[in-house]
Regions:
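Sec-dependent signal peptide recognition
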Residues: 1-8
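Boundary at the C-terminal end of the N-terminal hydrophobic targeting segment
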Residues: 15-18
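Substrate-binding cleft of secreted/luminal carbohydrate-active enzymes
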Residues: 21-22, 31, 96-109, 315-404
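The substrate-binding groove and active-site-proximal loops of carbohydrate-active enzymes
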Residues: 30-39, 67-79, 156-178, 259-274, ...
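Well-ordered, non-membrane alpha-helical segments in soluble/globular domains
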Residues: 37-55, 76-87, 169-187, 268-282, ...
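Aromatic-lined substrate-binding rim segments of carbohydrate-active enzymes
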Residues: 43-149, 277-284
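Acidic (Asp/Glu)-rich catalytic clusters
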Residues: 49-61, 85-95, 309-313, 335-343, ...
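Polysaccharide-binding and catalytic clefts of secreted carbohydrate-active enzymes
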Residues: 129-308
């Protein structure tokens, strides 16, 4: 498989009519014009903004599309459902293909019944919730109360979930049972000429332990102190266990039965993440999502690290984030290792950003990425970030126009 991709890239093979349609997807960022807590904000206006710059043409093999992240534990279920329906209706009204991203890992503010184990004065309090969050050692006595996230700026967030907790995983599956049928029903009712509007459903969101929700030594004591005094330490990509912060993952590793003493090793964290994603994908598949429309979102930071394996499972197509190697995916050894072993019909660059505002750099990067016909879509994170770099839109247009 890898050899086929590499030869196709070098030779610039064009399959023309035999090649599948591919997509450049623009992710509309939560909190920047769209927010599921305000369902009406996911309506036609945000689609029209994209279409004004990138109108689709039926004769183009590369089409543009829109995506949004629905964080299922961030808002009450009825609000999330309404937001999803508004989003899907707008996609149909504007004939815009979409990727529905369902996030079960981040922003679980609306489910204190899962994470609040320490504050009896607040909703959801239950000491047993220690089992649903991560620990800094092998005992639930070392459960964490706080975590930090840095997606451009460090902020305080709720604890990293225990990805192996039966109660937490069941809550994730319950939300899939709530949302996935809505997407499938919508797709089923589309006329034949609009069936292509559902590119796919993506599960997971850079699934990892300690990557997007990390903890500092003595972090629980910081909860009662001003955030301005919080430590800020650089992300250490080479440290595949703790990323240079406090080691967590003990809860998930112990709950999953991998080990309950000694030191955590790299395969432990990989196996937990892979099993978690496979569980979610199996649930979605059982609900009726075909493999070619189901994507699992993995990530890796150190070249070739085992975490890249996490999104590969029998139920979905693997997908990864690309920042460091966005200019040339052939250099991403972790992704290439998994493309060579995956039997999935497709894969995706489901979170993508090239750190350049140069039009030709973007054109060339997209050409390299989509030279593999198995790459279903590239999702640019985010649409809102493009405004500061006019060359990005120019590069995308140039690439699309160059395709037959």
């Amino acid at each position: 498989m890898m050899a086929r991709w590499f030869i196709g890239f070098l030779c610039g093979v064009g399959l023309h009519a035999a090649e599948p349609v591919q997509y450049i997807v623009f992710n509309r960022a939560p909190g920047q014009g769209m927010y599921q807590g305000e369902p009406e904000s996911l309506g036609r206006k945000v689609f029209d903004e994209v279409l004004a710059q990138f109108p689709n043409a039926a004769d183009k093999r590369v089409q543009t599309a829109v995506s949004h992240i629905f964080s299922v534990f961030r808002t009450p279920p009825e609000t999330t459902v309404k937001a999803l329906r508004v989003f899907l209706d707008a996609a149909e009204q504007t004939s815009t293909p979409v990727v529905v991203q369902i996030d079960t890992e981040h922003w679980w503010d609306a489910r204190p019944d899962l994470w609040n184990w320490w504050d009896a004065a607040k909703p959801g309090y239950n000491p047993a919730n220690r089992e649903n969050v991560e620990w800094t050692g092998w005992s639930s006595d070392l459960a964490i109360k706080i975590a930090w996230r840095d997606w451009g700026k460090q902020v305080r967030v709720l604890p990293q979930p225990n990805l192996s907790s039966p109660r937490y995983v069941e809550a994730c599956k319950a939300e899939l049972r709530r949302l996935v049928p809505i997407v499938l029903e919508w797709h089923g009712k589309l006329p034949a000429e609009k069936k292509h509007l559902l590119i796919g459903i993506k599960l997971g969101h850079e699934t990892s332990i300690g990557g997007s929700a990390y903890h500092y030594e003595g972090g629980n004591e910081l909860l009662a102190k001003p955030a301005v005094d919080d430590p800020v330490r650089p992300f250490d990509a080479e440290n595949v266990l703790s990323r240079g912060r406090a080691q967590i993952g003990f809860a998930a590793v112990k709950t999953s039965g991998i080990r309950s003493s000694g030191s955590i090793i790299e395969t432990d964290l990989r196996d937990v993440c892979q099993h978690y994603l496979a569980t979610l994908c199996r649930e979605a598949a059982q609900l009726g999502v075909p493999r070619e429309k189901l994507f699992a979102h993995g990530v890796g930071w150190k070249d070739g690290e085992l975490l890249y394996d996490a999104p590969v499972n029998p139920h979905a197509c693997p997908a990864w984030s690309f920042y460091k190697h966005a200019a040339d995916l052939r250099q991403d050894t972790g992704v290439q290792r998994n493309l060579a072993r995956s039997d999935a019909p497709q894969w995706a660059a489901c979170e993508y950003w090239l750190s350049s505002g140069d039009a030709m750099a973007w054109r060339d990067a997209l050409r390299k990425t989509l030279s593999d016909p198995r790459c279903r879509y590239v999702c640019i994170f985010n649409w809102e970030s493009m405004a500061a770099f006019p060359g990005i839109a120019e590069g995308i247009h140039t690439f699309i126009e160059s395709k037959p």
